[in-house]
Design a protein with these regions (language model features):
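Acidic/glycine-enriched connector segments
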Residues: 1-152
Length: 153
């Protein structure tokens, strides 16, 4: 993974009201921060919104790549069209299925330089991941953009 990679985390029930802010954040990451590699999951609403926004950005920036993070292998469900690649983090082979998504997400946070998030709900796996990401940001290891509060969440 590279420090110019960007990962996405958000709640599975995130709605389309964050789409405009998400598109703006992706454009900023490409044009101002030099991000070329975007990674997203494929299990929730925010994952879908992020993937769709990156695919739209790729029309203006064909050098951008979109990779789907796989917490399970095999994936277990069909992927949305448009991904350039899939990625299964090392060490996931023995992780129980119920822990696979948070573990894979944590691996990505630890190995990315940028995070675009939409996290607002306390006491959730996503909030726990956000706290881990914030600890990395405080140490200068990660740059976070949190879209929470844009639209209705």
């Amino acid at each position: 993974m590279q420090e110019r990679a960007c990962f996405f985390i958000g709640h599975r029930d995130t709605g389309p009201e964050v789409a405009a802010g998400l598109a703006d954040a992706i454009e900023r990451h490409i044009t101002e921060y030099g991000v070329r590699d975007f990674y997203t999951g494929h299990y929730g609403g925010f994952d879908r919104l992020a993937a769709q926004a990156v695919l739209r950005a790729k029309k203006r920036h064909p050098e951008v790549a979109l990779t789907c993070l796989l917490p399970y292998y095999p994936a277990g469900r069909p992927l949305m069209p448009g991904f350039d690649a899939t990625f299964y983090p090392p060490g996931m082979e023995d992780v129980p299925k119920r822990f696979a998504i948070p573990r894979a997400n944590r691996w990505m946070i630890a190995h990315s330089g940028y995070l675009i998030a939409c996290v607002w709900r306390p006491a959730s796996n996503t909030q726990g991941l956000m706290e881990y990401a914030l600890s990395r940001e405080r140490r200068g290891l990660l740059h976070i953009t949190n879209l929470a509060g844009q639209g209705d969440g």
